[in-house]
Amino acid sequence: MGEFKSQLRTLLKKNLLLKGKSKCAICCEILFPIIVILVIFAILVLVMAFKANYDPYNASNFVNRFENTVLLYGNADGALNVEQLGVMNILKNEVATAKNLNSTQIDQLFIEINDQTAMEAFFQNKSDFVFSAVWFNNSALSSGTNPFQYNIRVDSDDVMDTEELIKEDDTSDSEVYVKKRFVATQVAMDQAIFSYFGLNKTLNVKGQRYPDPWTELWQKWIQGRDGIFKDAGSVFITAALMIFGFRLITDLVIEKETKIRESMKMMGLNDLAYFISWMITSLVTALPVNLIISIILKGSSVIHHTNWGVVIFTLILYLLTLLLLAFILSMFFDKSKFCGLLSFVIIIAINIGGIFVAKYDFAPGAKLFLCLISPIAIACSIFAMSARDLEEINTYNWDMMVTENQVIGMLVLDIFFYIFLVWYLDNVVTTEFGTKQKWYFLFTKKYWFPKKCNENGDEQDIESTYQNEDVEMTPVGVGQKVTISIRNLRKEYNTGDGLRVAVNDLYLDMYENQIHALLGPNGSGKSTTIGMMTGLTPPTNGNAFVHGYGILNQMSSVRKHLGVCPQTDIIWQQLTVLDHLKIYASLKGVSPSEIQREAEKMAVEVDLGEKIHSQAGSLSGGQKRKLCLGIAFIGRSDVIFLDEVSSGMDPLSRRVVWDFLLKYKKGRTIILTTHYLEEADYLGDRIAIISHGKLRCDGSSLYLKNKFGCGYLLTCSKILSSMNNFNAQQVTEFIHNYIPEATILSNAGTELSYRLPTASLPHFAQFFREFDDRLQSFGLLTYGISVTTLEEVFLSLGREAALEKGGFNIDQNENQDLEQLRKSIAISSTGVKAGQQFKGLLIKRIKTSIKDAKSFFLTLVIPLVFIIGSIIMYKAMDKPQIFYNNATVPLTMNLGIYSGLENNFVPMQSSNELNWENSLNSSPYFNKFRFIPQTENFEDYLIEGKTNGSFAYKSSAGAINFTLPIDVSSTTIDYTAFYNKDYIHSLPVHINLVNDAVLRKHNNIGIQVTNMPFKHVLSNFDLASEGMNISSIVYFIIIMMAGYALMAGSFAGNVAQERTNRVKRLLYISGCKKYVYWLSNLVWDYFFSFILILLTTCILAGIRENYKSQFGLMFLCLILFCVSVVPLSYLLSYRFASFGKATGAITAIHFAIGIIFVIISLNLRIQVLIDQDVDFQKAADAVDIVFCILSPLFAYSRILFLVSEFPGSVRVGTLKVDNYWSMDYGGSPMIILAAHCIVWVSWIMILDYTPELIGKIRNPKNIEAPPPPDDEDSDVTAERTRLLSVGPNDEPLQFRNLHKLFPAVGKAAPKAAVYNSTLSIPKGQTFGLLGLNGAGKTTTIAMLCGDIVPSSGEVTINGHDLITDRGQALRSNGLCPQFDALITLLSAREQLTLYCAIKGVPEDKVKEVVEAFIKMMDLGAIANSNTGGYSGGNKRKTSLSIAMLGNPSIVSLDEPSTGCDAVVRKYIWNVVSELAKDKVIILTSHSMAEVEALCYRMTIMRDGKMKCLGSIQHIKSKFGAGYTFDVKFKKEYLDSGIQTVLKAIPNSIVLDEHDVMASFEIPNPPDNPVKISTLFESLSHLTILDDYNVSQTSLESVFLKLTGASYEDRLNLNNQKHTSD
């Protein structure tokens, strides 16, 4: 439990550190959910009832409003009767008096039309000038039984629908009567009627809406809650909270993708601690945000009746289930490319489905079962919470619903269910990495009750049947403990080309206190074996045991012993060195009190003491490997797997690692894979060689040399200048004259080696004497002799394996291969052809698209689903929308129309109840009146009536409040008519109710007013929208925009990925024309776009006539949109480093900007249509043009709205589009779209051609470089003087005063990566560029390839200035970069074919060249497999092949053999040697043997400066002297052996000593190498030595002297120690 707590604490710290490094992500996590909730909150605010009380409107304002209009009147009988005429005259006189008009003028305003048809016609023609009309149906006079009748006529859209009485929606409100002209006419007519019948009282009438009954805050949300939150609330909540799931799943999959999690598991990670740590990390920000969301929803009373605890608890439980779902979904992703986006979409889609589960009635049990899916559960919960708050207006069948309490129970159950799923799926889901259980594992006894395997008996049985004569069966030493037993381990892969056996029944034992080196060619199965041993890869068959625990079923026990340094770096870029070591120390069980000390100690031990607080991302490649080494060793690990731990390290760093391994091997079993055979020989107590997945041999280095080597190894170095005329046969014949049994081993590059049998030792003296004399005549520079080396053993076994398998053999077909190589190299580029490049690049895009199904799905299928979905929705929403009231059925405005309502009464209030009753008791509806005492506030009564049993608010159409008493003496009838908005005719009804009652009381004559609407005169908007569904058009276009935005975003992802992976850089350096690169991408993406365009336009043409008639416009618009948005997306991709981020962000950018602009534009256009304002239209046009310039998606939407005939698309004063192509309509957006294409493509070209442009504007050669260093080597100075004095010459590569200063980053000072270097390399020379990691080698190559612009200085390639004539300078360049820039979705064959096209290899020769390189590089077995699955060595071979294609004159090889085995490395040397005959080769390498084999001239860089310059022999002579010899003593003779050697060879110096190894230097050699060899042979006969090697002072010694002060310190320390002895 203590270990669990410690791990949990460490993982939490790790996660929080990672989280804290991304401030932007934290801000998004906090702000995004709150913004999402605020969005729905804003929507709810828009529809809420803002006021509990509403202001009264004056209804007695006819005279004031009667301006510049006319009033029509007439009688159906052809003339008005005396009463009607009298009333109208009174009304006329009132207007005339108020406005001071004469009779003629007033007659022009009151027009009598006694023909209904004529009146209708007049209104239709001049509706804008008609205030209202009064129509009398007959000429009958009024009486007690026949009220005064009149009809008020206004536009049907200015009154409510006369065919309905009650309408409960937000748009229905009796207020329209008072806002428009109906009530004003009604009150004016009633006033005139009063006057005509002698009632001289002035009507002062107001209309006022009922006070909102929902006075409390929670009630104000009713409309939004019912229409929006009840259904969509859960979607917004899910979207808000899923941001944490998005971040979590992305982090989880990234750790899986980079193998970090599995590496942690290998070293003791507790899965429970891992998951809990991520859960807690997510909750650190998620819980506070979740609480804020709860406070917003509950505190604002959007959720009211549900108590605080339920709301908060529900959201917390739901958040937990979302995070657990993120864990579950992460199991099914191996790549982080789309995991977050797809998971987000999946969860939202499920939640939307949950809305329908919540809404529709079906078995509650089934609903509860579906609530096992938590997004469905939250939909049911939000629906239930909203329903409780809506019970006052809606009725719900709770028997068919899931309550919020039930949902809480289900969410709790969900949590336990999801935890089980996380555990189960983590054990059984097969992914790219990790060993998984059988699906039924939880039902097996061995899972719950594991037993430690008793392997000994099993081993005896297996061992008795295992026979391999090339295995040293007895361990070295006495009493060695077997810690690892591998038994018939097998791994098979189905590659698509058949079954490939990676590991073939491997049988091997490894021992404690030993380093067991695991060697083999690339692809031999070394890394696969380690993967199976550590649980990274499940075995197909067999088993292995670590301390007795089997890897098949007891991997968790195995991993408690493991420390692993895999081939790839398992680091977090943002964490420091110390952070890493502390994390892994805790995982391995180091006590908390010791973690800090152990981590600091380990950092110093792996030579990272000065970098302990530096972020891992800032470390060099070698330093990252050291960090991984420290991670493997820290803590309790006693079984260490090191997979190419020193790969990419310089010699000094490699020696540090060697010292470390020898120091820490005690008590441990170390399994080491390496391609440096001297490293295996130096470190390995036992060495196993695997070939084609099968164990070839195993034993100590001495055993293998005795078994597979014989005698001595003579290694000669050729004079580079005589390479073309070198005759190896001549040397061989000379050797055979003295030693007939000598055999040639290797003739690669400048190296020539022979095996000399032991029996030939007596002939050595005479042979070497003659050989020394003829060395120069043979074209040889130096030679050395040693006993059989491990490399010879490796090469020998490699030949045997090749013969057995019929595979690659460097020697068997040497002449044939070299001849084929010469032919292939001789096929030169015939000149870069844009057409050929374009074809190759287009084929690249086609093949990568076909192979990347997910990208294809995202690029084409999902956008197509969006587009087709939008079209289906558009078609489904086919019913035309009517935005006006067109009902013309007459409706009498009296209370009788609402008489059917139960408990309906009219509340009335007056200052005098008796007076009130006496004044209104003549009304036929008097029994419906109810007096409200003056002591009670009338409006409060109406408000409280919602819960008052005596007053049913919903059943009350209106109320009357008299502000003055009604009596005989009063001259004014002053009252307010309150109306219930749901009773849509309430206001005129209640005004008539009072006026009718008052007149009846006066002279027993009533008033009957009828609403008789005119047929609606269509407005411009009505005309424009007639017959269409505007909502469907808007939704259709918005969804269509989303589809095309996603398409554009996905196109950008590919470009971002190629830029980040440096594929584009290599293409450019290889000669790809920049415009061709972009053209190929554009054409392919345009092709995809064309598919969508064709489908879209054809489908639209089939469903709508307007789309069919404007097919050409639509088609061209989409074409122009795509040709403009694709390059814009490319441009935006420069801000993003990965496919997923680029796709998601750019899609959001396009869509968000487009939608915002569309909303603004539509509102402006509709307002223009309504106002018919030309100036406003010009302003809207200007806004649209600006929006079109800023967003191609908006420009496309403008055409869509135009063709869809959206209201407002037409010009002011017109009803139809006369010419869709005119500048007023489609012309301007189309021209702007075309301009977009030109602008964005030009912008991209400018960005890409910036180096060339800089060269024209600011040539670095005109900028003065800093002065040369004071301590500059004389040879470097001589080269500088020579070049600067003679000026340009015919040497292919020259650079003068080359300097690169990188600006300061943060607090760091500016760094001079390359310091004022001058150099010229002649044709036919291989130049070595050496130095420690970070010395400036790669920066130099990058400047020579044009990838980095120098700060100062000039580079000339084949006479062309790299800055001012970049294209010609780089025309014949080849580059093998340090990090493979391969297209992972293409095979080696496909990549070579592509680069043949890029480099201009004749098309009829491409296949021949490609097949030759595949054969020579031994890639035949995997040539059709994607390079993403290649081993590191095979990737290097592919990269080298690309560099050599097209016979370039200058080839830069940046560590070309890193990760390659000895066989392949030798072959690469042959290739490079062949290239060097007529080319310039620039080579960087950390292998000194490689440099000696290949390079004629070299320099060693330190801190960006060249520390030496010249031939290898010159540098050796200048900085080293005499001979060096390395010996391996028998263990018991280490100390005495060193003293023996020092006494036997005077003046010898101890250079280095490690364990049983020692290196000596003889500054003043006593004699030639044969004498020294004779001396060591005699020592070996005395059983002091196991092995030795004699040679001239090694280049590595010189390298260490020139690059490392620590080397000199150690040299002095060694010699002081042995001198004192």
Swiss-Prot record:
Q: Name one GO cellular component term.
A: intracellular membrane-bounded organelle
Q: Does the keyword DNA repair apply?
A: no
- Which positions does UniProt annotate for ATP 1 binding? G520, P521, N522, G523, S524, G525, K526, S527
Transmembrane intervals = 30-50, 234-254, 276-296, 309-329, 338-358, 365-385, 405-425, 856-876, 1033-1053, 1083-1103, 1111-1131, 1142-1162, 1183-1203, 1227-1247
Which superkingdom is the protein from?
A: Eukaryota
InterPro entries (UniProt xref): AAA+_ATPase, ABC2_TM, ABC_transporter-like_ATP-bd, ABC_transporter-like_CS, ABCA, P-loop_NTPase
Which keywords fit this entry according to its UniProt record?
ATP-binding, Membrane, Nucleotide-binding, Repeat, Transmembrane, Transmembrane helix, Transport
Q: What is the name of the gene encoding this protein?
A: abcA2
The record's GO molecular-function terms, alphabetically, read: ABC-type transporter activity; ATP binding; ATP hydrolysis activity; ATPase-coupled transmembrane transporter activity; lipid transporter activity
The similarity annotation says: Belongs to the ABC transporter superfamily. ABCA family.
- Might you name a Gene Ontology BP term for this protein? lipid transport
Tell me the compartments it is located in: Membrane
> Which positions does UniProt annotate for ATP 2 binding?
G1331, L1332, N1333, G1334, A1335, G1336, K1337, T1338
Chief place of localization: membrane
Name used for this protein in its record: ABC transporter A family member 2
How does this protein sit in the membrane?
A: Multi-pass membrane protein
Give the ABC transporter domain ranges.
484-717, 1293-1528
